[in-house]
A protein has these predicted regions:
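Alpha-helical transmembrane segments of multi-pass membrane proteins
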Residues: 11-15, 76-87, 114, 138-149
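Interhelical loop and helix-boundary elements at the membrane-water interface
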Residues: 23-41, 85-105, 151-166
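Alpha-helical transmembrane segments and their lipid-water interface positions
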Residues: 18-22, 43-50
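Membrane-embedded helix-turn/re-entrant segments that form the catalytic/gating core
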Residues: 61-69, 73-95
Length: 175
């Protein structure tokens, strides 16, 4: 799972900088936007859904194994991510801010869970993360936040000027 997290973080890193570079070089195209969203769909849509699928499989009580349907609930994040990315592509309101949680932010939250399981030694944390109700709740919350009508700051730098990007720099420093 650590390699999954590594490659997802690498994909998110390149996703951030390819858009920045395209804007800086003024080479943005409609095809580029679609290809960017397709790459986002894999790194920030399919992967978190599969991670939740895996965690829900681990968390399923033995009595639920007969149906085996609970893990599939995690794939709702993939569908919500696809809807969010499609909505982003056609929206004219998201050039300076995001409406709803960006898919990479949601992905970073979800891929942190298996890493916590692997690298911490707290039985309480393991119990919480592998609680099926926690994972179902997280899935529902993620699906909602991805498409919530809430404006969030975007880390889209048009210039490196501190004055116009003070909020962005502050967010990065505080993170």
């Amino acid at each position: 799972m650590k390699w999954t997290a590594f490659f997802v973080c690498l994909g998110i890193f390149f996703d951030f900088f390819d858009g920045l570079l395209a804007r800086k070089l003024n080479v943005q195209t409609a095809l580029g936007l679609q290809l960017d969203s397709l790459a986002d769909m894999v790194t920030s849509g399919v992967v978190p859904g599969l991670v939740l699928f895996h965690l829900l499989g681990l968390a399923s009580p033995p009595s639920w194994e007969t149906t085996g349907l609970l893990p599939y609930f995690g794939l709702l994040v993939t569908l919500a991510s696809a809807y969010r990315l499609a909505n982003f592509n056609v929206s004219t309101e998201q050039s300076d801010a995001f409406i709803g949680l960006p898919t990479p932010a949601n992905t970073l939250l979800i891929i942190s869970l298996p890493l916590l399981l692997e690298y911490q030694n707290s039985a309480a944390v393991t119990t919480i993360i592998l609680n099926p109700w926690f994972l179902v709740g997280l899935t529902v919350l993620s699906c909602y936040l991805l498409n919530a009508p809430v404006k969030l700051i975007a880390l889209k730098f048009k210039t490196w000027d501190f004055k116009t990007n003070a909020n962005r720099y502050l967010l990065i420093i505080l993170s």
